[in-house]
Amino acid sequence: MSSTTLSPTTPSQLCSGKSGISCPSIALLVKPTRTQMTGRGNKGMKITCQATSIPADRVPDMSKRKTLNLLLLGALSLPTAGMLVPYGSFLVPPGSGSSTGGTVAKDAVGNDVVATEWLKTHAPGDRTLTQGLKGDPTYLVVEKDRTLATFAINAVCTHLGCVVPFNQAENKFICPCHGSQYNDQGRVVRGPAPLSLALAHCDVGVEDGKVVFVPWVETDFRTGDAPWWS
């Protein structure tokens, strides 16, 4: 009878429990080896695991994150690869500045967002991703009266930097990585995320009608606290 044996290089990093070996803080690399077992009492299979610590530089950094997260999210949610084309625009450099000192929002194909045109195709309650400040994926919010909200919501999860999709059915943002949840305004309602999603001001240019994002430095109206992202 043969068995599969895996040698642990760092046994102290393994966590054991009733359901077997597990540990959320490490990655397990399985390397099977074949051995011959003798004797009537040696029945069954014996398994150990080689554990490898996750390097610190692989933990998403809020200051260095890439908008590629958005592309990957689209790959999970769209039914065909051909439909991924619009998401390529989020890999271009951050949107151009405006005369007011903010950043002009860009849509999924890289065009500047014009408020009147946007509202023709986005219904009340809609939350759709655009490219915002520093190139971050940012939600434009359409109010019940068919106007744009004066705030926009940064889509980057405050836990480990995943892009958080909006769940229309539950009317909340739910992170696909570790289950963090935020209400429809981006306020955290369930961990492990420690903080609410960042905000940006959403203005409309008087002359050209383009949507402009401006850094939010005032009190967070959702929590009454100073903005952690400023």
Swiss-Prot record:
Pfam families hit by this protein: Rieske, TM_PetC
How is the cofactor bound here?
A: Binds 1 [2Fe-2S] cluster per subunit.
Q: Where is the transit peptide?
A: 1-50
Q: Which residues cross the membrane?
A: 72-92
Sorted keywords for this record are: 2Fe-2S, Chloroplast, Disulfide bond, Electron transport, Iron, Iron-sulfur, Membrane, Metal-binding, Plastid, Thylakoid, Transit peptide, Translocase, Transmembrane, Transmembrane helix, Transport
* Substrates-to-products reaction catalysed: 2 oxidized [plastocyanin] + a plastoquinol + 2 H(+)(in) = 2 reduced [plastocyanin] + a plastoquinone + 4 H(+)(out)
State its location(s).
Plastid, Chloroplast thylakoid membrane
Q: Which GO terms describe its cellular component?
A: chloroplast thylakoid membrane
| Binding positions ([2Fe-2S] cluster) | C157, H159, C175, H178
Identify which top EC class this enzyme belongs to: translocase
Q: What is its EC number?
A: 7.1.1.6
Q: Outline the extent of the Rieske domain.
A: 115-213
InterPro entries in the record, alphabetically?
Answer: Rieske_2Fe-2S (IPR017941), Rieske_2Fe-2S_sf (IPR036922), Rieske_Fe-S_prot (IPR014349), Rieske_Fe-S_prot_C (IPR005805)
Q: Which GO terms describe its molecular function?
A: 2 iron, 2 sulfur cluster binding; metal ion binding; plastoquinol--plastocyanin reductase activity
For this chain, the annotated S-S bridges are C162-C177
Identify the main location: plastid
Q: How does it sit in the membrane?
A: Single-pass membrane protein
Q: Which cofactor does it need?
A: [2Fe-2S] cluster
Spell out the subunit comment: The 4 large subunits of the cytochrome b6-f complex are cytochrome b6, subunit IV (17 kDa polypeptide, petD), cytochrome f and the Rieske protein, while the 4 small subunits are petG, petL, petM and petN. The complex functions as a dimer.
Q: Which NCBIfam families match?
A: PRK13474.1
Which family does the UniProt entry place this protein in?
A: Belongs to the Rieske iron-sulfur protein family.
Other notes: This protein is 1 of 2 subunits of the cytochrome b6-f complex that are encoded in the nucleus. The Rieske iron-sulfur protein is a high potential 2Fe-2S protein.
Q: What does it do?
A: Component of the cytochrome b6-f complex, which mediates electron transfer between photosystem II (PSII) and photosystem I (PSI), cyclic electron flow around PSI, and state transitions.
Q: What is this protein called?
A: Cytochrome b6-f complex iron-sulfur subunit, chloroplastic
